[in-house]
Amino acid sequence: MDELNIEIVAVDRKIWSGKGTFLFTRTTAGEIGILPRHIPMVAQLVDDNMVRIEREGEKDLRVAVDGGFLSVTEERVSILAESAEFDSEIDENAAKQDAESDDPRIAARGRARLRAVGAID
């Protein structure tokens, strides 16, 4: 099966680099699924975003991503984000509190984190 080389980088650290068969995310133009040999593109990610990466024979990766950009070539997907964290790193109760914040940036980050842990769609 064809695979993509995928890299997720936040301002403060490299989050993940590896191979995947499919990547799902949300851009300012709408939801998008990326398969190998996708048309090259660049897109801005929404602030309350969750990236899901399907991998052959392994559990899907779910990453909460705060803003940033997506760059796609036929063989590679790069995500450059303000911040990002794996679902396993997220405190769901703290994310719920953030999602209820009056500050729109904090609320967006909380929603992204809740999407990553599967608490909301």
Swiss-Prot record:
Flavoprotein among keywords: no
Keyword Ion transport appears in the UniProt entry: yes
InterPro entries, alphabetized: ATP_synth_F1_dsu/esu, ATP_synth_F1_dsu/esu_N, ATPsynth_dsu/esu_N
Any one GO MF annotation of this record: proton-transporting ATP synthase activity, rotational mechanism
Gene Ontology, cellular component aspect: plasma membrane; proton-transporting ATP synthase complex
Keywords for this protein: ATP synthesis, Cell membrane, CF(1), Hydrogen ion transport, Ion transport, Membrane, Transport
Membrane topology: Peripheral membrane protein
Main localization, broad class: membrane
Subcellular location: Cell membrane
Subunit architecture: F-type ATPases have 2 components, CF(1) - the catalytic core - and CF(0) - the membrane proton channel. CF(1) has five subunits: alpha(3), beta(3), gamma(1), delta(1), epsilon(1). CF(0) has three main subunits: a, b and c.
Family: Belongs to the ATPase epsilon chain family.
Summary of the function given for this chain in its UniProt record: Produces ATP from ADP in the presence of a proton gradient across the membrane.
Entry protein name: ATP synthase epsilon chain
Species this chain originates from: Mycobacterium leprae (strain TN)
Lineage of the species this protein comes from: Bacteria, Bacillati, Actinomycetota, Actinomycetes, Mycobacteriales
